[in-house]
């Protein structure tokens, strides 16, 4: 059985998350290393899955609190700012990615479950996310 570790994303892991992020474009938006690192540092919840010293999955989320709202307005985050006008007490899943070699192993499910646990522990009522339907449609 494979031994995966789950941890918060530190500066060492941020570069590895960036590599994985760029491998997952266009399913997630492209970001510069500096931009992704800045997002991770300002996020309210983040987590990486590490296997054999490689990041094979990660999630970055933002809660609608005062500091995050200020940050999201500063970077002009279109989706978060739109959701903020419609819902309150939410956690926005900004990006989630799993390495293509490790899909169908329930790792994405684990990231979502851990995100949900964070939301419940912090009395957050809603989970929100942008869903990209194109260029791919998931096939069961």
Model-derived regions: residue spans:
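Active-site rim helix/loop that mediates acceptor-substrate recognition in acyltransferases
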Residues: 26-52, 58-66
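Conserved acyl-donor/pantetheine-binding loop and adjacent beta-alpha core of acyl/acetyltransferases
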Residues: 60-95
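Glycine-rich phosphate/pyrophosphate-binding loop shared by adenosine-nucleotide-utilizing enzymes
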Residues: 2, 53-58, 91
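Short, flexible/disordered intra-domain loops and linkers
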Residues: 134-140
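Conserved acetyl-CoA-binding loop-helix of GNAT-fold acetyltransferases
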Residues: 98, 104-117
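Conserved GNAT acetyl-CoA-binding A-motif
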Residues: 119-134
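A short beta-loop-alpha structural element at the N-terminal edge
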Residues: 1-17
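Alpha-helical elements of Rossmann-like donor-binding domains used by nucleotide-donor carbohydrate transfer enzymes
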Residues: 16-20, 35, 54, 110, ...
């Amino acid at each position: 059985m494979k031994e995966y570790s789950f941890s918060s994303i530190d500066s060492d892991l941020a570069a590895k998350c960036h590599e994985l992020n760029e491998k997952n474009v266009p399913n997630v938006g492209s970001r510069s290393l500096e931009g992704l690192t800045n997002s991770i540092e300002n996020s309210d919840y983040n987590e990486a899955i590490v296997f054999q010293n490689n990041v094979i999955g990660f999630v970055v989320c933002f809660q609608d609190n005062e500091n995050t709202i200020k940050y999201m307005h500063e970077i002009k985050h279109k989706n978060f700012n739109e959701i903020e006008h419609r819902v309150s007490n939410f956690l926005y899943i900004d990006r989630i990615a799993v390495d293509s070699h490790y899909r169908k192993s329930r790792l994405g499910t684990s990231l979502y479950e851990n995100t949900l646990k964070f939301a419940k522990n912090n009395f957050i009522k809603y989970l929100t996310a942008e869903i990209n339907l194109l260029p791919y449609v998931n096939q069961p």
